[in-house]
Amino acid sequence: MIETLLQSPSSWTNFFIFFGLAVLLLFAVLGFVTYGILAERKVMGFMQGRIGPNQVGGRFGLLQTVADVLKLLLKEDSIPKAADKPLFILAPVIAFAPAFMVLAVIPFTDKFQFADIGVGLLYYIAVSGITTIGVVTGGWASNNKYSLLGGMRAAAQMISYEIPLVMSVIGIVLLAGSLNLNEIVAAQEKVWYIFVQPIGFVVFLIAAVAELNRTPFDLPEAESELVSGYHTEYSGFRWAFFMLSEYVYFFGMASLITVLFLGGWNPVMFLGFIPGAVWFALKFSSVVFLLIWFRVTFPRIRGDQLMEFGWKVLLPIALANIFLTALIKELFF
């Protein structure tokens, strides 16, 4: 359907169809993220020997996150007097919009994808970097030293870990011969790239956690050092924009890992009778669980350790993986 609409002449009908699909995707993602946050809180509670949310919406706390969202929407919208008002208002939108834009190219099954473009992987990496501009803008516009430090940390962290993140997937591009995410999944029909590219997977996973600003790389919003980091002065629905963008990226990155390294919707061996959507959901859930496990387990590292690890460890390993992959492809494929 999407391909037909893209190839048809421009018209107001097509515009409203695309607009309706975009709004539908927005609400679907927001609903998923709402309960994804609840799932994370329950898993963290289990790992820490707690029950987690258990009051609002029954014993499982099914409406806890919904109540939290309503609370944020009803809070007073305050803007500091000394803040740069236009940029302060614009920053959450700049951080929020790209988070949804990247989901357009993720193939969840062979038939369920919003837009199948030839350079889906390049598009994801390029668009995801825009969020950092929103974070830095919010930190600077707040006219608060803690916010500014958080924004500067976010920029330094993104620059340091975007490079090994990109380098780690070059091995996959060499093997698949394409930047199209559907073709990368198709190339894993016999063997998943996590087994062919174990070094690339480890580098990508670590760099992805750093890009998401999650523990142990959550320096831009380190509560014990910077109050709340770049969104210290934000409250209500503007703060919710930053939070939602963080979690949409979290689930988007888990989807990308599933596509690049775990074969997407490809089944395991003789279990092909199980629908591809189920396989994607299982692999995606495993990656999400692993990332939550990281958050609960590891302590935050220091800023100098973060920079050294990115430039002196991950980047050389990612470069070595490219040469190793090229050599293997030349000799055996």
Curated annotation (Swiss-Prot):
Pfam families tied to this protein: NADHdh (PF00146)
GO molecular function, a single term: NADH dehydrogenase activity
EC code(s) of this entry: 7.1.1.-
Summary of the function given for this chain in its UniProt record: NDH-1 shuttles electrons from NADH, via FMN and iron-sulfur (Fe-S) centers, to quinones in the respiratory chain. The immediate electron acceptor for the enzyme in this species is believed to be ubiquinone. Couples the redox reaction to proton translocation (for every two electrons transferred, four hydrogen ions are translocated across the cytoplasmic membrane), and thus conserves the redox energy in a proton gradient. This subunit may bind ubiquinone.
Its membrane topology: Multi-pass membrane protein
Residues annotated as transmembrane: 15-35, 88-108, 117-137, 159-179, 191-211, 239-259, 274-296, 313-333
Main location: membrane
Keywords, comma-separated and alphabetical: Cell membrane, Membrane, NAD, Quinone, Translocase, Transmembrane, Transmembrane helix, Ubiquinone
Subunit note: NDH-1 is composed of 14 different subunits. Subunits NuoA, H, J, K, L, M, N constitute the membrane sector of the complex.
Catalytic activity: a quinone + NADH + 5 H(+)(in) = a quinol + NAD(+) + 4 H(+)(out)
Record-linked PANTHER family: NADH DEHYDROGENASE SUBUNIT 1, NADH-UBIQUINONE OXIDOREDUCTASE CHAIN 1
Keyword Nucleus: no
GO cellular component: plasma membrane
NCBIfam families: PRK06076.1-2
PROSITE patterns the UniProt entry points to: COMPLEX1_ND1_2 (PS00668)
Cellular compartment(s): Cell membrane
Any GO BP: aerobic respiration
Homology family: Belongs to the complex I subunit 1 family.
InterPro entries per UniProt: NADH_UbQ_OxRdtase_su1/FPO, NADH_UbQ_OxRdtase_su1_CS
Name of the molecule in the record: NADH-quinone oxidoreductase subunit H
HAMAP family reported for this sequence: NDH1_NuoH
